[in-house]
A protein has these predicted regions:
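Acidic, glycine-anchored pre-beta loop/turn
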Residues: 143-152, 176-188
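Short beta-strand-turn/beta-hairpin segments enriched in glycine/proline and small hydrophobics
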Residues: 117, 128-141, 155-175, 192-193
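Extracytoplasmic/periplasmic/luminal assembly and interaction segments
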Residues: 34-82, 86
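Alpha-solenoid repeat junctions
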Residues: 43-50, 80-85, 112, 116, ...
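Conserved hydrophobic register position within alpha-solenoid helical repeats
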Residues: 36-39, 76, 108, 203, ...
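Amphipathic alpha-helical scaffolding segments comprising HEAT/armadillo-like alpha-solenoid repeats
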Residues: 12-27, 49-66, 85-98, 117-130, ...
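Short inter-helical turns and helix N-cap capping residues of alpha-solenoid HEAT/ARM repeat scaffolds
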Residues: 30-32, 68-69, 100-101, 132, ...
Length: 249
């Protein structure tokens, strides 16, 4: 799953929480979302150890899938994929496939593969392709990066008028779609990002479970090797290709 971030604004999520702290943090998510995120991370560790006590908080986890905090929804989508036996998680994840944030949608799509649900296939395939950042407003564009630079979620890519434009996902800048200083309309493309190697790898792992015959061209492209991608991505693509073909027979 796309959960490499154990730090958030200087908070270390490795500190072990008591059951009462987990309850407190989840119940106070509106005021202190990063503490709630800490609790979700701890719950994931409980699930991985087969600790059924964690089930007492499952209804709250479903509730948090509608929290306004992007980071919290992203973590929530990751966590709900850790227990495919709880049907309300399945239902909440399907709703997150239309979330406004790409990172939330991607984690939801990956988590759904643990339920054997292919509903997020479109999102998984999108993770194998470049991503375009568009402007939500009209105005004069001023870029803050160059072609070839790498961005992470939240990186400032530029401004349109006074509006900050930040990248919602990681990737390398493949192209700047407008001339610096140009006037742009709301909805126009600004930056094209490459597929991220970790996102591509996770998408291929997800497609191994739910990929279909019509996905073979995208997977085969990675199996042949894509410039800038590590060999483990190519190897994963080969495994995914083999599994999809075996299902299609």
């Amino acid at each position: 799953m796309l959960f490499p971030f154990l730090f958030w604004y200087g908070t270390w999520f490795g500190r072990k929480l008591s059951d009462s702290e987990i309850t407190e943090y989840l119940n106070n998510a509106a005021a202190k979302p990063r503490k709630a995120q800490h609790a979700l991370v701890q719950m994931g560790e409980h699930i991985s150890r087969g600790d059924t006590r964690v089930q007492q908080w499952y209804p709250k986890v479903v509730e948090l899938s509608e929290n306004p905090s992007l980071e919290l929804r992203q973590t929530d989508a990751w966590l709900m994929g850790q227990d495919h036996t709880y049907q309300p998680f399945h239902e909440a994840l399907r709703k997150l496939l239309v979330d406004s944030a790409p990172m939330v949608r991607r984690n939801a799509a990956l988590s759904l593969t643990n339920f054997g649900d292919p509903a997020g296939r479109g999102e998984l395939l999108a993770m194998l392709h470049p991503y375009t950042i568009s402007t939500p407003v009209a105005g004069t564009v001023k870029y803050r990066l160059k072609i070839g630079e790498y961005v992470n979620p939240g990186t400032l890519v530029g401004r349109v008028g006074t509006e900050e434009i930040r990248s919602p996902i990681p990737g390398e800048v493949l192209g700047l779609k407008k001339r610096d200083g140009a006037e742009v309309r709301a909805g126009e493309p600004l930056v094209e990002l490459s597929a991220d190697k970790e996102h591509a790898w996770e998408a291929l792992r997800g497609l191994l479970r739910v990929g279909q015959k019509q996905d073979l061209d995208d997977v085969q492209r990675y199996a042949r090797g894509v410039a800038g991608m590590p060999d483990r991505v190519r190897r994963q693509a080969a495994l995914t290709l083999q599994e999809i073909r075996s299902r299609a027979q």
